[in-house]
Design a protein with these regions (language model features):
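Conserved Walker A/P-loop ATP-binding site and its immediately adjacent core
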Residues: 46, 51, 60, 66-85, ...
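Interdomain hinge/linker at the junction between the two RecA-like core domains of SF2 helicases
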Residues: 163-204
């Protein structure tokens, strides 16, 4: 038996080794390179997006049948660009494509999240191109910049990414660069001792944004500022339903909200008429450890203060709290970087390389071979980088951690069905799409979605949908359900019919009804507890993430 196992294992290793010979770690994977590349580089609030939208409108006006696309990091930002283009060109000419939503997807002018940008067209705008260096989503920017076949590509980003963009787009016939400066001055507010001005919660001025880095911190500050100033305060953070975020942005822009308290989601391209931006902390938990904000991250946030046409200048200062860690020297650097006075770490960071299924051997490989071939691709790419110093300066290989974790869930779901029913495993193509989809590893949509794709069984997915339709009594519960719903909507657009319905399970219109229900429910729910308030006596805790004040904590056993 030992010999048999050894021979089987050796045969399997030989098979994988033969497959790995077809792994091809190419970077530029297009037959038709761009004729023309334009780089619009500069800090936030320097008019880069305005130039890009003007180029889209001009191109469509001249060549109405050609494909023009915009790709950005957020569904909210894509929607903002979509609405602007509709104003200028009319709704018949403009479409929206994100992972969760499609409006008029066959239109000649498209606003998209970067993962949804068509691979071919005539004019492409790539916004926030420094995201190509993001460990999780950077692969999508790198792939579009290196593989998308457009006659003209316009890339927007900070000055530091100029050499990276010129390397990624080096196959273009012509590259021109335009450097922009801020249209509105930005300054650090200083006191008489030349230290950064500090505001207390009771004197936060109107038209301010307060920055903290956790949902509980944001909610606690929102409650305290509203209570002590009497002003209208709203919260903004990543887990909120996108429509709820859009409502806050619109209300702040219209003057219906005086102060917005938000996480670093504001640094991802959200535009608000902010006059004063107050950091409540400069330290965040990034999923692995607590660390100081990098200068480029802080600059993206600080630069949101002072909007062209609405403010004479932007101001940055500090909000005093009992718990926030503030490093004043960093805030000064954020402002200097946001105004182009100093360079940030972006100049030393690298764009993320990630394989395509074609580079692993295509759909002819078996789904069980995917992780082995990804590892071979990774090794070959690292060898290639070692042999190419210029490439090594701008490119690094993705860790592939999230995709491989997703793969394990999908493989387990597939194996359970194969063992139980002797059916065929999930196809390689579906496996690859699903493991790279915007679906959390812990989400039930990943496991049961994979099983649905194998045998069409909708029983568990129906139970999940039923849970989404109940009335919720906390915002946190709604946020969890909304996340599951957006994953289901993404799944439907990837694997359903042209309308985004899942045959035999649910229509697109029903998904949209559930979304409307959750958003309506979200607007009516009042939280029973407020972060930063003791759950026993209602007094202040030392930090928003603590449930009890010190006195109640010390008396918990008495």
């Amino acid at each position: 038996k030992g010999l048999e196992e050894f021979l089987v294992e050796r045969e399997e290793n030989n098979r994988i080794q033969q497959l790995s010979e077809y792994v091809n770690p190419k970077m530029r994977d297009r037959k038709h390179p761009p004729q023309h590349v334009v780089l619009h580089l500069g800090p936030t609030n320097s008019g880069k997006t305005r130039h890009a939208i003007e180029a889209m409108v001009q191109h469509h006006t001249t060549y109405p049948q050609e494909t023009v696309a915009y790709g950005g990091p957020l569904r909210m930002l894509a929607m903002e660009v979509y609405e602007k283009l509709v104003e200028l060109l009319g709704e018949q000419s403009v479409g929206l494509i994100t992972g969760e939503q499609e409006i008029n997807p066959e239109a000649p002018v498209l606003a998209c999240t970067i993962e949804c940008v068509p691979q071919q067209g005539n004019l492409l705008i790539v916004d926030e191109c420094h995201w190509s260096m993001d460990n999780d989503r950077g692969k999508s920017w790198t792939n579009v910049l290196q593989s998308a076949e457009y006659e003209t590509i316009i890339a927007l980003g900070p000055d530091e990414v100029e050499p990276h963009m010129k390397y990624l787009l080096a196959d273009a016939y012509h590259i021109e660069t335009h450097h922009h400066t801020r249209l509105v001055p930005l300054e650090t507010m200083l006191n008489k001792q030349n230290n950064i001005q500090r505001f207390d919660i009771h004197n936060v001025p109107p038209k301010s944004a307060v920055i903290a880095f956790s949902k509980k911190s944001v909610l606690a500050l929102s409650h305290d500022i509203a209570e002590k100033t009497g002003l209208r305060v709203a919260s903004l953070y990543g887990k909120m339903p996108v429509d709820a975020r859009n409502t806050v942005v619109a209300q702040f822009a219209q003057g219906d909200i005086d102060i917005v308290v938000c996480t670093d989601v504001i640094g991802h391209g959200i535009n608000l008429p902010i006059e004063t931006l107050l950091f409540a902390e400069t330290e965040k938990y990034d999923g692995h450890t607590r660390r100081n904000l990098k200068v480029w991250e802080g600059a993206q946030i600080a630069g949101r203060a002072g909007r062209y046409g609405l403010s004479e200048k932007g101001k940055v200062a500090v909000l005093n709290t009992k718990w926030g860690t503030i490093k004043e020297s960093l805030i000064k650097e954020y402002v200097q970087a946001a105004t182009g006075q100093i360079q940030t770490e972006l100049g030393y960071m690298k764009c993320i390389a990630y394989p395509t299924l074609t580079q692993l051997g295509g759909e002819t490989i078996h789904m069980k071979d995917i992780p082995h071939l990804m590892n071979h691709w990774k090794n070959k790419m690292q060898e290639y980088l070692q042999q190419n110093p210029e490439m090594r300066q701008y490119i690094k290989v993705s860790t592939m951690e999230t995709a491989l974790q997703n793969y394990k869930v999908i493989y387990q779901a597939s194996s359970q069905l194969v063992e139980k029913t002797q059916c065929e495993p999930l196809s390689t193509s579906y496996t690859w799409q699903l493991m790279n989809a915007p679906i959390d590893t812990e989400s039930p949509i990943l496991h049961y979605g994979a099983q649905y794709l194998i045998n069409g069984n909708t029983e568990i997915l129906r139970m999940i949908i039923k849970d989404l339709q109940i009335h919720h009594y906390s915002k946190e519960s709604i946020e969890t359900s909304y996340r599951t719903l957006t994953e289901l909507m993404s799944f439907a657009l990837m694997f359903g019919d042209e309308e985004g319905s899942i045959p035999g399970l649910i229509q697109r219109s029903e998904l949209e009804e559930i979304e409307s229900h959750l958003i309506e429910n979200y607007g009516t729910v009042q939280e029973s507890t407020v972060p930063g308030r003791c759950i026993d006596c209602g007094g202040e805790t030392k930090a928003p993430w603590l449930e009890k004040c010190e006195a109640c904590f010390n008396n918990r056993f008495y």
